[in-house]
Amino acid sequence: MFLRLFRKYSTAKLAQDLRLYDGRLKEKVPLQIHQSKPYISFYTCGPTVYDSAHIGHASCYVRLDILQRILRHHFQLPLVTAMNITDIDDKIIVRAQEQQINWEQLARQYEDEFWSDLKRLNVRLPDVKLRVTDHIPAIIRFVQTLVEKGFAYTTIDGSVYFETSKYERYGKLQKVVIEPANESNKGYKRHPSDFALWKASKAGEPYWVASGFGDGRPGWHIECSTLASHLFGNKLDFHAGGLDLRFPHHENEETQSCCYHNVPDWVTHWLHTGQLHHEGQTHKMSKSLKNTVSINELLKDYSADEFRMLCLLSHYRNVIEYGPEAMVTARNVLQKFKSFFSDSKAYVDGLKPATYDAASTDSLLAKLSETRSSVVQFLNNDFNTANPVLALGELASSVQRLINSPQQSASHSSLIGSTNVGAVLAATEYIREELLSYGLESMGKQSTQYIQSTSETEQSLEKLIETIVSTRSEIRLQAVATKDAQLFKVCDLLRDRMSVANVELKDHGKTSSWSFRGRSTK
């Protein structure tokens, strides 16, 4: 009973605070939550598995993963997520013929690769995976119902088309002018805007037997309508995909689903992610343009977190520019946070001298409160993620200014409970929690040397690094005591060589600390 009341309260508050962009109205609207439902449905259009996925696909799924994480973590919504896999399509048939293999074998190969790619990108897999060929009988029944209701017609070759002129609200997502019927094309497609629900098979192509119309296979749009309806019924809370799917795919989905279920609107909130362009180009990355970068190629040069940070630094509806400059920016932002966590840990562990400044502590706690409030406001504004990252960076800078403050003196060593450790820890853990909530795995405590490693090899490596750092610290203390320039050069040289090995050394008075820099999450 308490949980039901809490959920009703929290979702009501969410509907009041969160604003989402509505592509139909061209404005932001409150989130509509059906409080009687025990879960929130979230359906994503998956790939047609005829080839390897590229980073244009990756940007869409990483961005949607970020949105789902925000809905779950920040707004405590009980999402149930689903994604389809289109494993029968003209492109699959053609590619299988080119490679002289069975079409099912080809589809399974690229489907397995797709799920593997999502895992490597730290994208949470959907709660339910819906493969088209596992639901052919349901698709046939969906098509038959639309024919019986008078919204679809059968052509002389056994194909079935949806008649767009029969649905007055066609063009709901994107304005469409329905042209007059082609009277000379009797027996076939009646209007240019009519779309295939069922495609009659040609010789040598895979097919399924369907009573009432010809043997064949599903059209593209009917697949998602059937699969989502099969799982979630006559109402979807969220339906997501790339901006290029808004028309005709999502338009046609919405149309046929409203007619099938006899509802005014099938989807409450459409979420469309912006496309990915190469730096300096104005057209999207696509296989037809032969300008794609595979996910495997991406992860050879960059970590999954670096690509995720690239996605976080722009609004999910905006175009992402991909290239060396953009990726260096994303990498640098990540590295600044990693360096901050290393500094903070060194301070808390006593490797950096403690600071004693009550005014600075109060200022930091005020900054923490301000950042919390700002992040909530940004996320409420149609999932703005770029500004929260900037706000967290500013908070991290405030912490670093405090722990590197000159207000460090042995004269305060007798004071009890007067250091800034509590405020530093509070701000540090808040920043870490936020970044982890966006799916940035390397922001966890396991990204530094302070966590217990489960690998004996890593443990040995860390002991070796500790020994090197400790020895260097002794040399450095000797250099300070004797003012020996040559010893200082040796210390600097060792620090630079460790940096090449992605180990960052930092000196704190008489002590030093280290952390892994730019460790890949692959």
Regions found by a protein language model. Give the residues of each.
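Short, well-structured beta-strand/strand-turn elements
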Residues: 77-80, 150-156, 501-506
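N-terminal, positively charged nucleic-acid-binding surface of large information/translation enzymes
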Residues: 25, 30, 34-122, 483, ...
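Short, glycine/charge-rich beta-strand/loop segments that flank catalytic centers
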Residues: 82-88, 111-114, 124-139, 157-164
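Short low-complexity, flexible loop/linker segments enriched in glycine and/or proline
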Residues: 94-97, 252-254, 521-522
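Alpha-helical recognition segments enriched in aromatics with Gly/Pro capping
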Residues: 5-50, 65, 74, 116, ...
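Structural preference for alpha-helix termini/caps and helix-kink/transition segments
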Residues: 283-285, 292-522
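The substrate-binding groove and active-site-proximal loops of carbohydrate-active enzymes
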Residues: 96-103, 127-133, 214, 242
